[in-house]
Regions:
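Conserved tyrosine-mediated DNA breakage-rejoining catalytic core shared by Y-recombinases
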Residues: 3-8, 55, 64-101
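Basic, Lys/Arg- and aromatic-enriched nucleic-acid-binding interface segment
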Residues: 1-59, 63, 106, 147
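Conserved short hydrophobic patches within well-ordered secondary structure
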Residues: 29-32, 54, 153, 193-200
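C-terminal catalytic core of tyrosine-transesterase DNA break-rejoin enzymes
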Residues: 50, 54, 60-61, 146-170
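C-terminal secondary-structure termini that scaffold catalytic or DNA-interacting sites
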Residues: 106, 115-118, 181-212
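Active-site/catalytic core of tyrosine-dependent DNA strand-transfer enzymes
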Residues: 21-26, 93-139, 150
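Catalytic-site neighborhood detector that most strongly recognizes the C-terminal catalytic loop/helix
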Residues: 19, 81-85, 167-195
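Short, polar N-cap/turn motifs at the start of nucleic acid-interacting alpha helices
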Residues: 69-76, 140, 158-179, 202-206
Length: 212
């Protein structure tokens, strides 16, 4: 497994666009937590936005996450980049790991973010919900802004990638070097989580009430 270069396509922040600055992140997270909606759909939409900003995925990548993309034992999320058809793996921070475990307990279907209203079976473009959060926190953001926010923070925290890229079809041996590499990526992802979720991170983890 080789680390991606910082400037590879998947990680680039498109120019001349917005992101949620650090001063407004707490307000944004608070709006998601406090938003009062109905039923499972509301919770799915909230979890989707949090996953988007904590992974840097494109909207369509996150919408179509399948449970086969999630390794709950290892705490990783994998996907194929539609732009270069390459397989990537992200080591989740602890909150996101808890969130995925919670969602799996609640959802035994094939999609991480299911929707009974969609022909595909998973959520598609929840712009109405995004706009409600916009109004609640008095911020204007797009789905792509969440991706840019993640990479803005990542690029200011470290010049190392938080993503692994598989370059061949062989599994790597579980040696000390690889274990240290995985833990390093997890630690850095936790730092990103701490900045994004701020004072709400520990509260959110405690509210899930399950073990990793």
């Amino acid at each position: 497994v080789n680390l991606l270069k910082k400037k590879q396509l998947w990680e680039e922040i498109p120019p001349r666009r917005n992101y949620i600055d650090v001063d407004n992140l707490t307000k944004w997270v608070q709006a998601i937590i406090e938003y009062k909606g109905r039923g499972q759909e509301n919770e799915t939409n909230k979890d989707f936005l949090l996953t988007l900003i904590l992974t840097g995925l494109f909207r369509n990548e996150c919408e179509s996450l399948h449970w086969k993309n999630i390794d709950l034992e290892e705490g990783t999320l994998s996907f194929i980049n539609p732009y270069n058809n390459v397989y990537y793996k992200i080591y989740m921070g602890n909150f996101l790991w808890y969130l995925m475990k919670k969602r799996r307990i609640q959802n035994k279907g094939e999609w991480v973010f299911p929707s009974v209203k969609s022909e595909s079976g998973h959520i598609i473009n929840i712009s109405k919900f995004r706009k409600k959060i916009n109004e609640q926190c008095n911020l204007s953001f797009t789905f792509q802004d969440l991706r840019r926010t993640f990479y803005f923070l990542l690029n200011n925290l470290t010049n190392k990638s938080l993503v692994s890229k598989r370059t061949d079809q062989y599994e790597e041996k579980l040696d000390v070097k690889n274990i240290a590499h995985a833990q390093d990526m997890r630690n850095r992802m936790n730092k990103v989580e701490q900045i994004i979720l701020g004072p709400y991170r520990d509260e959110l983890i405690k509210s899930i009430n399950i073990n990793l």
